């Protein structure tokens, strides 16, 4: 009697076959130890960020006795937990946002064209895999890579496009920004 695969397992494979070229970045790898009666058992923990460079990103952590296996587990978990982030002009965020996770606190700001990715370490990996080209980011809290990545993804999950905000409020996109002000003419001296 063969067991039926649980729901959700099949979708994972289909999504990878759809032609979504996922790129993954290894953020950190760490040797960890479990203390047992006979001494210490060493293993490796990996943190990986995965994205399609078109607005989808996810992160995952994996642990195993060998490094490649830990990276594989982390990559699988990252693919399962991907989120979609709306991007302005396909290159930056729609608005400034803050994200927190544990002691990790990050501030993300939209940037004009040509700025590039101004972000440190783990945050840079998230933006590169996400496909954002212009952003300014600052980590104010913990420097722990896990907390920085989780805070960054938490901030990105709050990002909303003007169209989605307008539909949620039952308004038109033009109503969100209000009437345009005419530029004040300089006074003659």
Swiss-Prot record:
InterPro entries documented for this protein: Ribosomal_Su5_D2-typ_SF, Ribosomal_uS5, Ribosomal_uS5_bac-type, Ribosomal_uS5_C, Ribosomal_uS5_N, Ribosomal_uS5_N_CS, Ribsml_uS5_D2-typ_fold_subgr
Subunit record text: Part of the 30S ribosomal subunit. Contacts proteins S4 and S8.
Biased composition (Basic and acidic residues): 172-189
Region (Disordered): 164-189
One Gene Ontology cellular component annotation held by this UniProt entry: small ribosomal subunit
One GO term of the biological process aspect: translation
HAMAP family in alphabetical order: Ribosomal_uS5_B
Domain comment, as recorded: The N-terminal domain interacts with the head of the 30S subunit; the C-terminal domain interacts with the body and contacts protein S4. The interaction surface between S4 and S5 is involved in control of translational fidelity.
Organism: Acidiphilium cryptum (strain JF-5)
Family: Belongs to the universal ribosomal protein uS5 family.
The protein's role, per its UniProt record: With S4 and S12 plays an important role in translational accuracy.
Record-level Gene Ontology MF annotations: rRNA binding; structural constituent of ribosome
Domain S5 DRBM span(s) in chain numbering: 22-85
Gene3D superfamilies per record: 3.30.160.20, 3.30.230.10
Keywords carried by this UniProt record: Ribonucleoprotein, Ribosomal protein, RNA-binding, rRNA-binding
Protein name (database record): Small ribosomal subunit protein uS5
